[in-house]
């Protein structure tokens, strides 16, 4: 909302009229509203303004989504949304994210806290993801925890490892615990991806859409990938994990190679530049070969699924164009 005025009375009038327009069409209407606007513009959305905006809607006719709780919890800043019902939500992916990301232990602690301190107007847990695919276990955890509140986090991790390998395996259990403690430590953010997705540049990450930030040492994930490859499993989820973690390992290594290439460039060392360039091309080729090992990473599958919505060639091309635009 870019309000013409930011006084509490005017904001309350806006929310009241929005609800009344809904109720005029459906007396049972419930307004579903993201809490993101309060986080995005804290200068204007003071506590007084938030209170006026929320309390001008009849109680229980407004349901708030606390949109990005792994990073900022609005319920804590607004006296639990001043009594209006709300959902605690995990976002996890802003739509352009291809990194292994998610703050597992923090999410666990925050969910436990909202269950105990969130008030009677907490209606449940949700997910506000804008993309999906590469961090499946984080979403499994959030939605499982909404129901299995008596299960310890480490027990849940062990069960996850068992499900993804198809049997109980000590190595798989240990590496998944390490993943949750050492790799899944930072929340996702906009443009979270490796430099393999970026336009070539000697320094930096080219654009906000390609931020290769991680909260772990590259060697940690490399060793976990090596351990995963020693596990015996014929499960599709296991193969997905091998490809997914390996994809991240290769993407991380590309940053190191790019930086070494830049150092050689600054030294005017052409042989070293050619060597690092060859290694970067090899990583890109390896990445292509690896992701071809699982259909979830297939461009062809993505495009075929999009084209299947079309009823003729023109509409099929339309849906394919949209599918290509999304990525």
Regions found by a protein language model. Name each.
Residues 99, 130, 228-235, 247:
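Membrane-targeting and insertion segments and their boundary/processing signals
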């Amino acid at each position: 909302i870019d309000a013409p005025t930011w006084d509490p009375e005017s904001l309350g009038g806006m929310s009241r009229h929005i609800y009344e327009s809904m109720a005029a069409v459906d007396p049972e209407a419930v307004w579903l509203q993201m809490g993101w606007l309060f986080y995005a513009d804290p200068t204007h959305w003071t506590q007084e303004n938030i209170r006026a905006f929320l309390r001008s809607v009849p109680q229980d006719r407004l349901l708030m989504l606390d949109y990005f709780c792994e990073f900022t919890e609005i319920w804590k800043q607004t006296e639990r949304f001043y009594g209006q019902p709300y959902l605690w939500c995990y976002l996890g992916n802003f739509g352009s994210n291809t990194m292994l990301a998610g703050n597992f232990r923090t999410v666990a602690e925050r969910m436990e806290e909202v269950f105990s301190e969130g008030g009677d107007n907490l209606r449940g847990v949700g997910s506000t993801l804008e993309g999906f695919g590469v961090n499946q276990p984080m979403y499994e955890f959030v939605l499982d925890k909404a129901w299995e509140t008596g299960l310890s986090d480490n027990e849940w991790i062990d069960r996850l490892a068992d499900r993804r390998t198809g049997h109980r395996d000590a190595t798989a259990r240990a590496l998944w615990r390490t993943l949750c403690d050492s790799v899944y430590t930072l929340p996702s953010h906009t443009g979270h991806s490796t430099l393999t997705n970026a336009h070539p540049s000697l320094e930096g990450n080219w654009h906000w859409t390609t931020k290769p930030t991680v909260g772990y040492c590259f060697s940690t994930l490399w060793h976990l990938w090596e351990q995963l490859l020693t596990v015996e499993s014929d499960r599709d989820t296991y193969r997905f994990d091998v490809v997914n973690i390996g994809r991240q390992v290769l993407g991380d290594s590309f940053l190191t190679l790019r930086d070494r290439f830049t150092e050689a460039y600054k030294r005017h060392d052409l042989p070293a530049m050619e060597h690092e360039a060859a290694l970067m091309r090899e990583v890109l080729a390896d990445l292509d070969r690896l992701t071809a090992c699982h259909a979830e990473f297939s461009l062809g599958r993505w495009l075929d699924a999009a084209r299947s919505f079309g009823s003729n060639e023109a509409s099929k091309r339309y849906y394919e164009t949209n599918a290509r635009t999304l990525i």
